[in-house]
Amino acid sequence: MKELTYEEVLDQIEHQRRFGNRPGAEVSALMLEKLGRPQQNMSVIHIAGTNGKGSVSAFLCSILKEAGIRTGMFTSPHLVDFRERICVDGQMISREEVTKLGNMLLEEDFGTVPTMFDYCLAMALLYYRDRQCQAAVIETGLGGRLDSTNAIGVPEVTVVTKIGYDHMAVLGDTLDKIAAEKAGIIKKGTKLVLESQEKDAMDVLLETAEKEAVTEIKIADMHDVTECRYENGRQYFSYQKYKNLEMAMLGVHQYENAAAAILAAEIFLKDRGISDEKAEYYIREGIKKTRWEGRMEILSREPFFMVDGAHNGNGVAALAESLRTLFPGEKFHFVMGVMADKNYEEMIEELLPLALDFKTVTVESERALAAQELSEKIWAKGICDAGLLHSFDELMPGRLDVAHKTIAFGSLYFVGEIEKYFQDVTKITKNLQIY
Protein backbone atom coordinates (compact mmCIF):
# COMPACT_ATOMS: atom_id res chain seq x y z
CA MET A 1 0.00 0.00 0.00
CA LYS A 2 1.44 3.36 -1.02
CA GLU A 3 1.97 5.93 1.71
CA LEU A 4 -0.93 8.35 1.99
CA THR A 5 -0.49 12.11 2.07
CA TYR A 6 -1.76 14.21 5.00
CA GLU A 7 -4.95 15.04 3.08
CA GLU A 8 -5.49 11.39 2.12
CA VAL A 9 -5.02 10.25 5.72
CA LEU A 10 -7.68 12.70 6.92
CA ASP A 11 -10.00 11.68 4.10
CA GLN A 12 -9.64 8.00 5.06
CA ILE A 13 -10.12 8.63 8.78
CA GLU A 14 -13.01 11.08 8.45
CA HIS A 15 -14.94 8.69 6.21
CA GLN A 16 -14.93 5.89 8.78
CA ARG A 17 -18.19 5.17 10.52
CA ARG A 18 -19.02 7.83 13.11
CA PHE A 19 -19.03 6.92 16.79
CA GLY A 20 -22.79 7.42 17.03
CA ASN A 21 -23.46 4.42 14.77
CA ARG A 22 -21.78 1.90 17.05
CA PRO A 23 -21.47 3.05 20.64
CA GLY A 24 -19.04 1.16 22.83
CA ALA A 25 -15.41 1.18 23.94
CA GLU A 26 -14.63 -2.40 22.85
CA VAL A 27 -12.98 -1.50 19.53
CA SER A 28 -10.81 1.21 21.10
CA ALA A 29 -9.83 -1.21 23.87
CA LEU A 30 -8.82 -3.80 21.28
CA MET A 31 -6.85 -1.21 19.29
CA LEU A 32 -4.99 0.12 22.32
CA GLU A 33 -4.13 -3.40 23.47
CA LYS A 34 -2.72 -4.25 20.04
CA LEU A 35 -0.76 -0.98 20.04
CA GLY A 36 0.88 -1.83 23.37
CA ARG A 37 -1.37 0.26 25.63
CA PRO A 38 0.27 3.61 24.82
CA GLN A 39 -1.57 5.30 27.71
CA GLN A 40 -0.09 3.08 30.43
CA ASN A 41 2.80 5.36 31.47
CA MET A 42 0.84 8.60 31.67
CA SER A 43 -1.63 9.82 34.28
CA VAL A 44 -5.06 10.49 32.83
CA ILE A 45 -7.70 13.08 33.72
CA HIS A 46 -10.95 11.91 32.11
CA ILE A 47 -13.71 14.49 31.54
CA ALA A 48 -17.39 13.96 30.69
CA GLY A 49 -20.42 16.26 30.74
CA THR A 50 -22.89 18.00 28.46
CA ASN A 51 -21.36 21.48 28.57
CA GLY A 52 -17.98 22.80 29.64
CA LYS A 53 -15.77 19.76 28.90
CA GLY A 54 -13.53 21.64 26.49
CA SER A 55 -13.17 24.68 28.72
CA VAL A 56 -12.28 22.58 31.78
CA SER A 57 -9.78 20.64 29.65
CA ALA A 58 -8.17 23.86 28.46
CA PHE A 59 -7.95 25.31 31.98
CA LEU A 60 -6.42 22.09 33.32
CA CYS A 61 -3.85 21.74 30.56
CA SER A 62 -2.80 25.36 30.98
CA ILE A 63 -2.32 24.85 34.75
CA LEU A 64 -0.31 21.65 34.29
CA LYS A 65 1.83 23.33 31.65
CA GLU A 66 2.66 26.07 34.18
CA ALA A 67 3.69 23.32 36.59
CA GLY A 68 6.10 21.89 34.02
CA ILE A 69 4.04 18.71 33.53
CA ARG A 70 4.04 17.77 29.85
CA THR A 71 0.37 17.21 29.08
CA GLY A 72 -1.57 15.92 26.10
CA MET A 73 -5.10 17.15 25.45
CA PHE A 74 -7.69 15.22 23.44
CA THR A 75 -10.89 17.07 22.53
CA SER A 76 -13.59 17.09 19.87
CA PRO A 77 -14.89 18.32 17.55
CA HIS A 78 -12.33 20.60 15.94
CA LEU A 79 -13.32 24.08 14.74
CA VAL A 80 -11.02 24.74 11.78
CA ASP A 81 -8.15 22.26 11.79
CA PHE A 82 -8.33 18.52 12.52
CA ARG A 83 -5.10 18.86 14.51
CA GLU A 84 -6.89 20.89 17.22
CA ARG A 85 -8.11 17.54 18.58
CA ILE A 86 -4.59 16.41 19.55
CA CYS A 87 -2.32 18.83 21.42
CA VAL A 88 0.69 18.71 23.73
CA ASP A 89 1.31 21.70 25.99
CA GLY A 90 -1.03 23.79 23.85
CA GLN A 91 0.65 22.98 20.53
CA MET A 92 -1.27 21.07 17.88
CA ILE A 93 0.16 17.86 16.48
CA SER A 94 2.12 18.50 13.26
CA ARG A 95 0.86 17.52 9.82
CA GLU A 96 3.88 15.22 9.54
CA GLU A 97 2.96 13.35 12.73
CA VAL A 98 -0.67 12.98 11.63
CA THR A 99 0.56 11.58 8.32
CA LYS A 100 3.01 9.15 9.94
CA LEU A 101 0.66 7.88 12.65
CA GLY A 102 -2.33 7.85 10.31
CA ASN A 103 -0.55 5.66 7.77
CA MET A 104 0.54 3.27 10.50
CA LEU A 105 -2.97 2.97 11.97
CA LEU A 106 -4.72 2.60 8.62
CA GLU A 107 -2.34 -0.19 7.58
CA GLU A 108 -2.88 -2.10 10.83
CA ASP A 109 -5.39 -4.96 10.83
CA PHE A 110 -7.42 -4.62 14.01
CA GLY A 111 -9.85 -7.39 13.06
CA THR A 112 -12.74 -4.93 13.03
CA VAL A 113 -13.71 -1.58 11.51
CA PRO A 114 -12.77 1.28 13.86
CA THR A 115 -14.74 4.51 13.78
CA MET A 116 -13.24 7.92 13.11
CA PHE A 117 -13.26 8.54 16.86
CA ASP A 118 -11.44 5.25 17.56
CA TYR A 119 -8.69 6.24 15.12
CA CYS A 120 -8.42 9.74 16.59
CA LEU A 121 -8.07 8.44 20.16
CA ALA A 122 -5.43 5.88 19.15
CA MET A 123 -3.49 8.52 17.22
CA ALA A 124 -3.61 10.90 20.19
CA LEU A 125 -2.35 8.36 22.72
CA LEU A 126 0.44 7.18 20.41
CA TYR A 127 1.49 10.79 19.93
CA TYR A 128 1.44 11.50 23.66
CA ARG A 129 3.57 8.42 24.27
CA ASP A 130 6.05 9.49 21.59
CA ARG A 131 6.24 12.96 23.16
CA GLN A 132 6.75 11.38 26.60
CA CYS A 133 3.72 13.09 28.11
CA GLN A 134 3.41 12.73 31.86
CA ALA A 135 -0.32 13.44 31.79
CA ALA A 136 -3.23 13.35 29.36
CA VAL A 137 -6.51 15.24 29.64
CA ILE A 138 -9.06 13.17 27.72
CA GLU A 139 -12.51 14.53 26.85
CA THR A 140 -15.32 12.09 26.05
CA GLY A 141 -16.94 12.33 22.65
CA LEU A 142 -20.46 11.20 23.51
CA GLY A 143 -21.80 10.20 26.92
CA GLY A 144 -19.29 8.18 28.90
CA ARG A 145 -20.22 4.57 29.57
CA LEU A 146 -20.11 3.56 25.90
CA ASP A 147 -17.65 6.21 24.74
CA SER A 148 -14.43 5.11 23.03
CA THR A 149 -12.37 7.02 25.60
CA ASN A 150 -13.63 4.69 28.33
CA ALA A 151 -11.04 2.21 27.04
CA ILE A 152 -8.22 4.15 28.72
CA GLY A 153 -8.54 2.32 32.05
CA VAL A 154 -8.76 3.94 35.49
CA PRO A 155 -7.95 7.66 35.37
CA GLU A 156 -6.17 9.39 38.23
CA VAL A 157 -8.87 12.07 38.28
CA THR A 158 -12.37 12.02 36.79
CA VAL A 159 -14.32 15.23 36.14
CA VAL A 160 -18.02 15.51 35.30
CA THR A 161 -19.12 18.95 34.12
CA LYS A 162 -22.67 20.27 33.78
CA ILE A 163 -25.18 17.65 32.62
CA GLY A 164 -28.16 18.70 30.52
CA TYR A 165 -30.42 17.52 27.71
CA ASP A 166 -28.40 16.65 24.61
CA HIS A 167 -27.97 13.59 22.34
CA MET A 168 -31.17 12.24 23.91
CA ALA A 169 -31.74 9.66 21.16
CA VAL A 170 -28.55 7.93 22.31
CA LEU A 171 -28.20 8.86 25.99
CA GLY A 172 -31.82 8.90 27.16
CA ASP A 173 -34.62 11.42 27.58
CA THR A 174 -34.35 12.16 31.31
CA LEU A 175 -31.55 13.73 33.34
CA ASP A 176 -31.04 10.62 35.44
CA LYS A 177 -30.64 8.45 32.32
CA ILE A 178 -28.19 10.91 30.77
CA ALA A 179 -26.30 11.18 34.06
CA ALA A 180 -26.06 7.38 34.25
CA GLU A 181 -24.31 7.36 30.87
CA LYS A 182 -21.91 10.13 31.92
CA ALA A 183 -21.29 8.35 35.24
CA GLY A 184 -19.97 5.38 33.27
CA ILE A 185 -16.49 6.94 33.36
CA ILE A 186 -16.41 6.87 37.19
CA LYS A 187 -14.25 3.87 38.10
CA LYS A 188 -13.00 2.22 41.26
CA GLY A 189 -9.83 3.94 42.48
CA THR A 190 -10.31 7.29 40.77
CA LYS A 191 -10.69 10.69 42.45
CA LEU A 192 -13.78 12.62 41.41
CA VAL A 193 -14.56 16.28 40.74
CA LEU A 194 -18.15 17.30 40.00
CA GLU A 195 -19.68 20.55 38.85
CA SER A 196 -22.98 21.38 40.54
CA GLN A 197 -25.91 19.49 39.02
CA GLU A 198 -29.66 19.28 39.16
CA LYS A 199 -30.74 16.84 41.89
CA ASP A 200 -31.65 13.95 39.57
CA ALA A 201 -28.23 14.05 37.93
CA MET A 202 -26.27 14.60 41.15
CA ASP A 203 -27.99 11.68 42.88
CA VAL A 204 -26.91 9.32 40.08
CA LEU A 205 -23.32 10.59 40.12
CA LEU A 206 -22.96 10.29 43.90
CA GLU A 207 -24.56 6.83 43.94
CA THR A 208 -22.10 5.69 41.29
CA ALA A 209 -19.19 7.20 43.22
CA GLU A 210 -20.26 5.32 46.36
CA LYS A 211 -20.70 2.06 44.45
CA GLU A 212 -17.25 2.40 42.87
CA ALA A 213 -15.63 3.34 46.20
CA VAL A 214 -14.19 6.56 44.77
CA THR A 215 -11.30 7.64 47.01
CA GLU A 216 -12.05 11.39 47.02
CA ILE A 217 -14.92 13.61 45.88
CA LYS A 218 -14.81 17.38 45.41
CA ILE A 219 -17.73 19.51 44.22
CA ALA A 220 -17.25 22.86 42.50
CA ASP A 221 -19.86 24.85 44.40
CA MET A 222 -20.81 28.20 42.87
CA HIS A 223 -21.46 29.51 46.39
CA ASP A 224 -17.67 29.58 46.76
CA VAL A 225 -17.30 31.83 43.69
CA THR A 226 -17.29 35.48 44.79
CA GLU A 227 -16.19 38.98 43.76
CA CYS A 228 -16.96 38.43 40.07
CA ARG A 229 -16.41 41.35 37.72
CA TYR A 230 -15.78 42.13 34.05
CA GLU A 231 -13.14 44.71 33.24
CA ASN A 232 -11.33 45.63 30.02
CA GLY A 233 -12.29 42.45 28.22
CA ARG A 234 -11.32 40.10 31.07
CA GLN A 235 -13.13 38.47 33.98
CA TYR A 236 -11.99 38.46 37.60
CA PHE A 237 -13.25 36.34 40.50
CA SER A 238 -12.31 34.70 43.78
CA TYR A 239 -12.74 31.00 44.53
CA GLN A 240 -12.23 29.62 48.00
CA LYS A 241 -8.70 30.68 49.06
CA TYR A 242 -7.78 31.96 45.59
CA LYS A 243 -8.43 35.71 45.58
CA ASN A 244 -8.80 37.96 42.54
CA LEU A 245 -8.16 35.34 39.87
CA GLU A 246 -7.94 36.71 36.33
CA MET A 247 -9.11 34.99 33.14
CA ALA A 248 -9.48 35.87 29.49
CA MET A 249 -12.31 33.36 29.04
CA LEU A 250 -15.65 35.16 28.96
CA GLY A 251 -19.04 34.03 30.27
CA VAL A 252 -20.46 33.55 33.74
CA HIS A 253 -20.43 29.77 33.22
CA GLN A 254 -16.63 29.89 32.99
CA TYR A 255 -16.40 30.64 36.71
CA GLU A 256 -17.70 27.16 37.49
CA ASN A 257 -15.58 25.55 34.77
CA ALA A 258 -12.51 27.25 36.21
CA ALA A 259 -13.50 26.11 39.72
CA ALA A 260 -13.77 22.48 38.57
CA ALA A 261 -10.36 22.74 36.90
CA ILE A 262 -8.87 24.22 40.08
CA LEU A 263 -10.17 21.32 42.19
CA ALA A 264 -8.87 18.71 39.73
CA ALA A 265 -5.51 20.49 39.52
CA GLU A 266 -5.26 20.62 43.32
CA ILE A 267 -5.63 16.84 43.48
CA PHE A 268 -3.21 16.23 40.63
CA LEU A 269 -0.51 18.58 41.94
CA LYS A 270 -0.84 17.40 45.55
CA ASP A 271 -0.38 13.79 44.40
CA ARG A 272 3.01 14.89 43.05
CA GLY A 273 4.14 16.49 46.28
CA ILE A 274 3.83 20.05 44.99
CA SER A 275 3.42 22.55 47.82
CA ASP A 276 0.21 24.55 48.23
CA GLU A 277 2.14 27.77 47.62
CA LYS A 278 3.56 26.57 44.30
CA ALA A 279 0.24 25.00 43.32
CA GLU A 280 -1.55 28.32 43.84
CA TYR A 281 0.95 30.07 41.56
CA TYR A 282 0.50 27.45 38.82
CA ILE A 283 -3.28 27.62 39.15
CA ARG A 284 -3.37 31.42 39.09
CA GLU A 285 -1.10 31.67 36.03
CA GLY A 286 -2.78 28.78 34.24
CA ILE A 287 -6.27 30.24 34.61
CA LYS A 288 -5.03 33.65 33.45
CA LYS A 289 -3.37 32.29 30.31
CA THR A 290 -6.12 29.92 29.15
CA ARG A 291 -7.59 30.51 25.70
CA TRP A 292 -10.29 28.36 24.12
CA GLU A 293 -11.48 29.23 20.64
CA GLY A 294 -15.15 29.38 19.77
CA ARG A 295 -16.38 29.96 23.33
CA MET A 296 -17.64 33.52 23.65
CA GLU A 297 -14.73 34.49 21.44
CA ILE A 298 -14.58 38.05 20.15
CA LEU A 299 -13.53 38.06 16.48
CA SER A 300 -14.00 41.81 16.04
CA ARG A 301 -14.35 44.59 18.62
CA GLU A 302 -15.30 47.51 16.34
CA PRO A 303 -17.86 46.62 15.15
CA PHE A 304 -18.40 43.95 17.79
CA PHE A 305 -18.73 40.34 16.61
CA MET A 306 -18.62 37.34 18.94
CA VAL A 307 -18.96 33.61 18.23
CA ASP A 308 -20.04 31.01 20.77
CA GLY A 309 -20.32 27.24 20.39
CA ALA A 310 -23.47 26.97 22.55
CA HIS A 311 -25.50 24.20 20.91
CA ASN A 312 -28.16 23.11 23.41
CA GLY A 313 -30.62 24.66 25.83
CA ASN A 314 -28.27 24.83 28.81
CA GLY A 315 -25.43 26.23 26.72
CA VAL A 316 -27.60 28.95 25.21
CA ALA A 317 -29.06 29.78 28.64
CA ALA A 318 -25.49 30.32 29.86
CA LEU A 319 -24.79 32.50 26.82
CA ALA A 320 -27.91 34.58 27.54
CA GLU A 321 -26.98 35.01 31.21
CA SER A 322 -23.45 36.02 30.24
CA LEU A 323 -24.64 38.62 27.73
CA ARG A 324 -26.97 40.13 30.33
CA THR A 325 -24.14 40.27 32.86
CA LEU A 326 -21.40 41.57 30.57
CA PHE A 327 -23.54 43.98 28.56
CA PRO A 328 -26.50 44.98 30.76
CA GLY A 329 -29.48 46.52 28.99
CA GLU A 330 -28.19 45.80 25.48
CA LYS A 331 -29.92 43.97 22.64
CA PHE A 332 -28.14 42.01 19.95
CA HIS A 333 -28.18 40.79 16.36
CA PHE A 334 -28.08 36.97 16.48
CA VAL A 335 -26.82 34.67 13.74
CA MET A 336 -27.93 31.07 14.27
CA GLY A 337 -27.06 27.74 12.67
CA VAL A 338 -28.13 24.47 14.32
CA MET A 339 -28.45 20.73 13.89
CA ALA A 340 -31.97 19.42 13.34
CA ASP A 341 -31.68 16.98 16.26
CA LYS A 342 -31.09 19.77 18.80
CA ASN A 343 -33.75 21.45 20.93
CA TYR A 344 -33.53 24.65 18.88
CA GLU A 345 -36.96 25.89 20.03
CA GLU A 346 -35.60 26.15 23.59
CA MET A 347 -32.47 27.87 22.30
CA ILE A 348 -34.57 30.47 20.47
CA GLU A 349 -36.72 31.12 23.55
CA GLU A 350 -33.64 31.78 25.69
CA LEU A 351 -32.42 34.58 23.40
CA LEU A 352 -35.64 36.19 22.17
CA PRO A 353 -35.75 38.73 25.05
CA LEU A 354 -32.26 39.92 24.03
CA ALA A 355 -32.79 39.95 20.28
CA LEU A 356 -33.00 42.83 17.84
CA ASP A 357 -33.29 40.25 15.06
CA PHE A 358 -32.04 36.85 13.87
CA LYS A 359 -30.25 35.72 10.72
CA THR A 360 -30.19 31.98 10.06
CA VAL A 361 -27.70 29.71 8.28
CA THR A 362 -27.75 26.11 7.07
CA VAL A 363 -24.67 24.51 8.63
CA GLU A 364 -22.56 22.32 6.33
CA SER A 365 -23.69 19.00 7.80
CA GLU A 366 -26.16 16.32 6.82
CA ARG A 367 -27.68 16.78 10.30
CA ALA A 368 -28.26 20.52 9.81
CA LEU A 369 -31.63 22.24 10.09
CA ALA A 370 -32.41 24.24 6.95
CA ALA A 371 -32.00 28.00 7.44
CA GLN A 372 -35.44 28.68 5.93
CA GLU A 373 -37.17 26.37 8.40
CA LEU A 374 -35.25 27.85 11.33
CA SER A 375 -36.09 31.38 10.22
CA GLU A 376 -39.79 30.49 9.98
CA LYS A 377 -39.71 29.06 13.51
CA ILE A 378 -38.29 32.33 14.85
CA TRP A 379 -40.63 34.49 12.77
CA ALA A 380 -43.64 32.56 14.11
CA LYS A 381 -42.79 33.70 17.64
CA GLY A 382 -43.84 37.20 16.60
CA ILE A 383 -41.18 38.87 18.75
CA CYS A 384 -38.56 40.03 16.26
CA ASP A 385 -37.54 39.93 12.62
CA ALA A 386 -35.83 36.84 11.17
CA GLY A 387 -34.19 36.30 7.79
CA LEU A 388 -31.51 34.33 5.99
CA LEU A 389 -27.79 35.06 6.03
CA HIS A 390 -26.82 34.70 2.39
CA SER A 391 -23.05 34.86 2.81
CA PHE A 392 -20.47 34.92 5.60
CA ASP A 393 -19.25 38.09 3.93
CA GLU A 394 -22.16 39.80 5.70
CA LEU A 395 -20.30 39.09 8.97
CA MET A 396 -17.14 40.90 7.96
CA PRO A 397 -16.36 44.05 9.99
CA GLY A 398 -17.23 46.40 7.13
CA ARG A 399 -20.75 44.96 6.87
CA LEU A 400 -21.71 44.74 10.55
CA ASP A 401 -23.86 47.18 12.52
CA VAL A 402 -21.52 49.44 14.50
CA ALA A 403 -24.26 50.46 16.94
CA HIS A 404 -25.16 46.96 18.16
CA LYS A 405 -23.24 43.77 18.87
CA THR A 406 -23.58 40.67 16.67
CA ILE A 407 -23.45 37.18 18.20
CA ALA A 408 -23.20 33.93 16.18
CA PHE A 409 -24.07 30.64 17.93
CA GLY A 410 -25.86 27.30 17.65
CA SER A 411 -23.22 24.73 16.72
CA LEU A 412 -19.48 24.20 17.09
CA TYR A 413 -19.43 23.17 13.43
CA PHE A 414 -21.07 26.48 12.51
CA VAL A 415 -18.58 28.44 14.62
CA GLY A 416 -15.79 26.51 12.91
CA GLU A 417 -17.10 27.54 9.48
CA ILE A 418 -17.09 31.19 10.54
CA GLU A 419 -13.59 30.94 12.03
CA LYS A 420 -12.25 29.38 8.83
CA TYR A 421 -13.94 32.03 6.68
CA PHE A 422 -12.42 34.80 8.80
CA GLN A 423 -8.97 33.24 8.45
CA ASP A 424 -9.35 32.83 4.68
CA VAL A 425 -10.55 36.40 4.17
CA THR A 426 -8.16 38.14 6.56
CA LYS A 427 -5.24 35.81 5.68
CA ILE A 428 -4.47 35.71 9.40
CA THR A 429 -3.83 32.21 10.71
CA LYS A 430 -4.18 31.97 14.46
CA ASN A 431 -1.22 30.86 16.51
CA LEU A 432 -1.01 27.10 16.95
CA GLN A 433 -1.20 27.72 20.72
CA ILE A 434 -4.58 26.36 21.80
CA TYR A 435 -4.55 27.48 25.43
Regions found by a protein language model. Name each.
Residues A25, L32-Q40, E66-G153, L171:
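ATP-dependent carboxylate-amine ligase catalytic core
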Residues N41, D130-R131, A135-T140, L146-V159, ...:
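Nucleotide phosphate-binding/pyrophosphate-handling subdomain across enzymes
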Residues F74-P77, E195-S196, T208-Y230, M247-V252, ...:
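Beta-strand->loop->alpha-helix junctions that form or flank phosphate-binding loops
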Residues M1-G49, V56, S62-A67, F74:
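Short functional linear segments
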Residues A179-K187:
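Membrane-proximal helix-turn-helix segments that form the acceptor-binding/catalytic region
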Residues K2-L4, G153-V154, I267, H311-Y435:
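ATP-dependent carboxylate-amine ligase
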Residues V157-T161, I186-E195, K359-T360:
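Conserved beta-strand/loop subsegment of P-loop NTPase cores
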Residues P77, C120-V170, M202-K243:
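Extended acidic/charged loop-beta regions that coordinate divalent cations
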